Design a protein with these regions (language model features):
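A ligand-binding cleft/hinge motif common to bilobed small-molecule-binding domains
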Residues: 57-71, 127-128, 157-189
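Hydrophobic residues within well-ordered alpha-helices
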Residues: 48-49, 103, 163-164
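Glycine/small-residue-rich loop that forms an oxyanion/phosphate-binding "nest" at active or ligand-binding sites
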Residues: 65-97
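Short beta-strand->loop
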Residues: 73-83, 136-142, 180-200
Length: 275
């Protein structure tokens, strides 16, 4: 495997720690990578398209951005087990609403403007269930960490707390976040309920330039697949990155973000032009 430059967005301070550990892991397995850090996903995809990096650890929206900009020529690598088969939950106060249609004319909270799981996919989900964006409900956005595509969870959590406090009637959050907030007491399971769930979708994935050879991508993936959660050193990396196993990437899981982008009039192109 040739030396690969791999982009990563610093959505939290631990990102640099994670990639220091991953870089050492590759060295121990006879390969060399160089982590290149970015402050947001637009700059990361810019670098990928310009050939300044070979790969990017991308959000669903950033993967779609790369796919559209490369006219479908981008390649993909592995993802985390926790990236597969995610859902977003529509959450309300317990007993307040019975159906999605009951939210017509109400105020719905969303995460940051560019969050796939807490805004874009939810808006398309509401559209598919008869509620049109900009017409059938008032949207209240919690723009925390714009440019990070919702990875920081901030706006998503703020929207949830606004729902709990009665500032909005409903909110959306990733299934894993909902479970974590119920578990740690951030939200009271006796006060809230899941009104509806989206279909499954996939989250982050490694995106490669069209010029990166299939052999190098396979070598990159094969080394990542060697991480073993039962090994204490590997477990440290995997716990920080939120997984128990690296698995092959796949394209089918990005249909919902693609549909959301189209519903909002090529959101990512307009969004990038304003950054």
């Amino acid at each position: 495997m040739k030396k690969l430059k791999v982009g990563a967005v610093i959505y939290a301070p631990r990102v640099t720690v994670i990639w220091d550990l991953i870089t050492k892991f590759y060295e121990e397995n006879g390969a060399e990578i160089e982590a290149v850090f970015f402050k947001d996903y637009k700059l990361q995809v810019d670098a990928l398209m310009n050939g300044e990096i070979d790969a990017a650890w991308n959000s669903p929206l950033a993967q779609l951005d790369a796919h559209l900009r490369s006219e479908g020529k981008e390649k993909i690598g592995c993802m985390r087990d926790t990236d597969r088969d995610r859902k977003t939950y529509l959450v309300v106060k317990k007993g307040k609403f019975e159906n999605i249609s009951d939210l017509k004319g109400k105020t719905i909270g969303f995460g940051a403007i560019d969050s796939p799981q807490a805004r874009l996919i939810p808006i398309n989900f509401l559209h598919n269930n008869g509620l049109e964006f900009g017409k059938d409900y008032t949207d209240k956005r919690f723009d925390i960490g714009v440019g990070l595509h919702g990875d920081h969870v901030g706006g998503e959590k703020d929207s949830m707390m606004a729902m709990v406090n009665g500032e909005v009637d409903a909110t959306f959050c990733l299934d894993l976040n909902y479970d974590a907030w119920i578990s740690d007491g951030t939200i009271d399971k006796n006060e809230v309920e899941v009104l509806a769930k989206t279909d499954y979708f996939d989250h982050c994935v490694f995106t490669f330039t069209p010029e990166t050879s299939d052999e190098d991508i396979k070598a990159f993936d094969d080394i990542m697949f060697k991480m073993d959660y039962n090994n204490e050193r590997d477990k440290e990396i995997m716990d920080l990155e939120g997984l128990k196993q690296w698995v092959p990437g796949r394209r089918d899981g990005f249909k919902q973000i693609t549909a959301a982008n189209e519903y909002l009039g090529n959101f990512i192109k307009e969004y990038n032009s304003e950054q």
